[in-house]
Amino acid sequence: FIFAGMVMLRGGAAKRLVDFATALVGHWPGGLGIAMVIAMGFFAAFCGSILAAITAVGTIMMPKMLEQGYPRPFVIVLAASAALLEALIPPSNAAILFSALTNVPVSQTFAAGVIPGLILLVFMVIVVLIKCRNIRNPEPASAAERWRSFLGALPGLFTPTIILGGIYAGLLTPSESAAVAGVWAIVMGFFIYRELTFASLCLALKETATITAIIFAIIATATFLSVVLTYSQIPPHIVRYFPDMGATFALFWVALAIICLLLGTFVEIVPVFYLTVPIFAAITLSFNQSLLHLYVVFVAFAGI
C-alpha cells in the first residue's frame, strides 16, 4: 500500500486528486485547508500509511496554503491531524497490524474504520471552516474546470474500488490487493498520466523502502518489549485484577483514552499497538465487548 501511494505521488495521480479536491472546495472559507483534508481522505482510500500521506499530500498542499496566507503552525498541525485519516479509512496499515495482533479478520477492521473515519473528516472540515473563514480564497473553479479535474482524478479514485472490491468480493487477500494496487499505480503513471519514468519509479521504491524500514525498526523494538511483558506474565495479572479492583467498563475506556493519548503524544502509533493492544484486548474480551470497538477508539486516541 505504501508503494502504491509513492508511485501515485511520482506518477501524477496524487497531484490530480489534490487538484480535484481544490476544484471542489478551494473557494470555500478555508478552502485550501478543506481541500487538504479531503485529499487526505482520498489518499487514505488507497494507501493507509500516515507517513506516505504526509509525504504525498502535504508536500503538494502545504506550500499552496502558506502562499495563500495560512499560518504556518496551523498548516503543519492540520497536515499531521488529517493524516490520522490514513489510520481509520481502509485500507489502513493500522487495521492490518491490529488484525495481526488480535486475530480479528482484516476485512472487519477495514469495515469498522469507514464511518468513524468519515465522521472525523467532517469534523475536521468544520474546524477549518470556522478557524480560517477570514483567509482569502482562490476564485471558484468553473464547471468545465471541475469536470476536467474529475476526469483527471478518475483513475486514482477508481483505486479504492480495486482494493476494497477485491477484498470484499473474496477475490483478493489484503496482501494481494496491495500488490494489485501497486501494479495499477504503475499502469496509471506510465500509460494514463505518462508522468512516471524509470528514475521516478526507482525513487518511489527507495522512499517505500525507507518508510518500511522506519516502521519495521520500530516494530522490532516494540516486539522485544512486548515479549518481555508476556514472559513477565504482566497482561494476565492485569486482566485478573482489573475487575477485582471494582473497575467498570466505562472506567476502562477512560483509562484507555488517557493512556493512548499520552503514549501517542510521544511515540509512533505502531509501538503503542505492540505494547498495549494485547493487554487492552484481553481486558475488552473479559468484559464481553467487541474488539472492533477497541480498534476504533484505540486508533483515534493513539493517533492524535
Name the predicted role of every residue range:
Residues 1-304:
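Alpha-helical transmembrane segments of multi-pass membrane transport proteins
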